[in-house]
C-alpha cells in the first residue's frame, strides 16, 4: 500500500508539473519558438516543413540558419540564409523576438506579428517597397501582417508561399498593390533568388 501511495504521488506530481509547464507555455504568445531555439542558446537542429535549420546563440544574438535541402553551406550564401535576432526579453519569454538579416538591397525581418521583407531606396515608383508573403495581403502605408501567429507557422507559410505580394508608392504618392508568382516555392532559397533576380 505504501509503494502504491508513492507511485500515485509520483503520477500526481508529473501531471502537476505538466500542467504548470503548459500554463507557462500558453502565457507566451510565441510559445512555439521553443521548437526552433534552445532556451540556453546551445545549437539546435531541426526542420520547418522539410526545410532544415540550425539555430544558436552567439555574442548575445539568436541566429537561425535555414538550408536548401541537403546542401552544405558555402561562403557566398547561395544555399542558406540567416536571421539574426537582435532583441529578446529573456530565455524563457521570447515572445518579443525581432529578427533581421540584410542581403543585397533588402532586409528580412521576423517579428512576433509576422514575416516581412523590406527593400529601401529602390528607384521604381519613387518610394519605399514593403514586401510580404501572405494569402490575403493587406496593403497599407506601412504593411501590416493581420495575423498574430507563432514563429513556426509563419516561417512555414513563407516557405510554402505561391506568390509574392508587394506594394509601392507611385509618382502621385499613392500606394499601388501588385503581385508576382514565385517559382519552385518549396525551397526558401529559391524565394530569395527570385527576389535577388527581380531587383
Where are the regions that the model predicts?
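A generic "folded-domain core" signal
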Residues: 25-199
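Classical Sec-dependent N-terminal signal peptides that target proteins to the secretory pathway
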Residues: 1-28
Amino acid at each position: 500500500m505504501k509503494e502504491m501511495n508513492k507511485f500515485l504521488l509520483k503520477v500526481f506530481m508529473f501531471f502537476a508539473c505538466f500542467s504548470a509547464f503548459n500554463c507557462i507555455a500558453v502565457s507566451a504568445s510565441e510559445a512555439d519558438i521553443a521548437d526552433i531555439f534552445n532556451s540556453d542558446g546551445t545549437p539546435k537542429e531541426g526542420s520547418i516543413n522539410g526545410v532544415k535549420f540550425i539555430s544558436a546563440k552567439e555574442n548575445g544574438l539568436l541566429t537561425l540558419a535555414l538550408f536548401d535541402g541537403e546542401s552544405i553551406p558555402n561562403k557566398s550564401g547561395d544555399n542558406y540564409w540567416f536571421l539574426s535576432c537582435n532583441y529578446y526579453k529573456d530565455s524563457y519569454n521570447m515572445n518579443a523576438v525581432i529578427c533581421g538579416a540584410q542581403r543585397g538591397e533588402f532586409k528580412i525581418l521576423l517579428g512576433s506579428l509576422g514575416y516581412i521583407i523590406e527593400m529601401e531606396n529602390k528607384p521604381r515608383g519613387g518610394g519605399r517597397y514593403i514586401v510580404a508573403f501572405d494569402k490575403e495581403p493587406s496593403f497599407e502605408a506601412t504593411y501590416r501582417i493581420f495575423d498574430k501567429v507563432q514563429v513556426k507557422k509563419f516561417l512555414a507559410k513563407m516557405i510554402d508561399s505561391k506568390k509574392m505580394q508587394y506594394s509601392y508608392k507611385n509618382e502621385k504618392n499613392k500606394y499601388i498593390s501588385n503581385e508576382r508568382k514565385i517559382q519552385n516555392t518549396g525551397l526558401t532559397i529559391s524565394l530569395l533568388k527570385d527576389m535577388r533576380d527581380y531587383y
